[in-house]
């Protein structure tokens, strides 16, 4: 081996060793009270103790809502990754009444926001192998594609950016539970189609095609959905390259809009809009996942992810409720509408991605 070859070999070894160590440094040595293990446990326990929610309204819900589904899913993955059997037991106990007196709360899977419920029983099956959970979740995943379009998409497709998480996670979970690649192929096709149709030249996504605003949480669902998909999509899958390209393009754009405090804003490219925590947690989750899997440059994105997490911690109440969560928002082609949206504390739109972040740090 000549001197030049030896130098290149040593350099390659150094890069292979140093890069993981760099991200380990950024994702450890947390200030007191801010570690993902501590925060994740607090939020998961708080969720177990919280009755079923209804989008911030005082009356009880008529069905399990999608923010609760997203939080339940995050709590389950955190409990598994932290090997916290007590948390897992509490999360399973929360589900028990849905097989009995609360069966009426199971959503009818005729719409994206309802069908996403399937992600929870499918995750429980993945962890427990209890057949009743697979039967429930798989039936919903199959119904979502009972009448596909000529292009092979679900008839629940509506080209709202939220769907890039809501719709895709059901098919991903069905794939993770069964190993049947038809579910993976469905979700990947759906995501690639949405990317092709909706991603803007700057890498971000309008809230709707006729509403040209980059609303934080809407884009957050997209970022989280792509991160989830890429974790399961094989390297040779035909949809992986376009999804990876869309993901990396979005992450590059987001990096320039992160505030000095680590937090993104209600409208991503409007720094005068308020700091918004649900979108920040979703973007942070996507970046943690990208760094951990080697999809993103660690030197650029590991510090951004750390800064995002620590910024979020400053909005946490002692009981685990996070502040500055934008209320559920329908589209409207009016800037002031987004600037004036109410900020909630403890809304599950914010609790959920905090748990996703805690899980991502532990993976």
Annotate each language-model stretch with its function:
Residues 161-162, 172-267, 273-284, 296-330, ...:
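Extended ligand-binding clefts on enzyme/binding-domain cores
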Residues 153-154, 267-269:
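Acidic interhelical loop/turn segments
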Residues 52, 83, 99-104, 129, ...:
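Helix-capping and short linker residues that terminate individual alpha-solenoid repeat units
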């Amino acid at each position: 081996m000549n001197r030049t070859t030896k130098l290149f070999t040593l350099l390659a070894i150094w890069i292979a060793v140093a890069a993981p160590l760099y991200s380990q440094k950024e994702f450890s040595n947390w200030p007191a009270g801010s570690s993902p293990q501590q925060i994740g446990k607090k939020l998961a326990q708080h969720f177990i103790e919280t009755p079923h929610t209804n989008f911030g309204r005082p009356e009880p819900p008529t069905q399990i809502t999608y923010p609760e589904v997203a939080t339940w899913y995050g709590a389950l993955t955190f409990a598994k990754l932290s090997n916290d059997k007590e948390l897992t037991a509490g999360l399973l106990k929360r589900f028990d009444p849905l097989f009995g007196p609360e069966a009426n709360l199971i959503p009818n899977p005729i719409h994206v926001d309802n069908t996403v419920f399937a992600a929870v029983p499918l995750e429980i099956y993945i962890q427990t192998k209890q057949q009743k959970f697979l039967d429930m979740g798989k039936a919903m995943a199959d119904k979502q594609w009972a009448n596909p379009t000529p292009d092979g998409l679900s008839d629940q497709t509506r080209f709202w950016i939220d769907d890039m998480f809501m719709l895709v996670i059901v098919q991903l979970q069905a794939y993770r539970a069964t190993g049947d690649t038809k579910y993976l192929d469905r979700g990947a096709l759906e995501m690639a189609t949405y990317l092709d149709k909706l991603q803007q030249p700057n890498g971000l996504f309008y809230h709707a095609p006729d509403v040209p605003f980059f609303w934080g949480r809407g884009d957050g669902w997209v970022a989280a959905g792509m991160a989830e998909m890429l974790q399961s999509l094989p390297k040779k899958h035909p949809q992986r390259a376009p999804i990876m390209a869309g993901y990396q393009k979005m992450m590059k754009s987001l990096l320039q809009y992160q505030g000095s405090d680590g937090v993104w804003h209600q409208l991503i490219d409007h720094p005068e809009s308020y700091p918004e925590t649900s979108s920040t947690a979703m973007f942070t989750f996507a970046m943690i996942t990208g760094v951990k899997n080697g999809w993103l440059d660690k030197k650029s994105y590991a510090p951004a992810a750390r800064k995002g997490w620590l910024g979020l911690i400053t909005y946490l109440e002692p009981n685990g409720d996070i502040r500055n969560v934008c209320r559920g928002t329908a589209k409207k082609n009016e800037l002031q509408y987004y600037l004036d949206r109410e900020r909630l504390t403890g809304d599950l739109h914010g609790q959920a991605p905090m748990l996703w972040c805690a899980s991502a740090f532990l993976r």
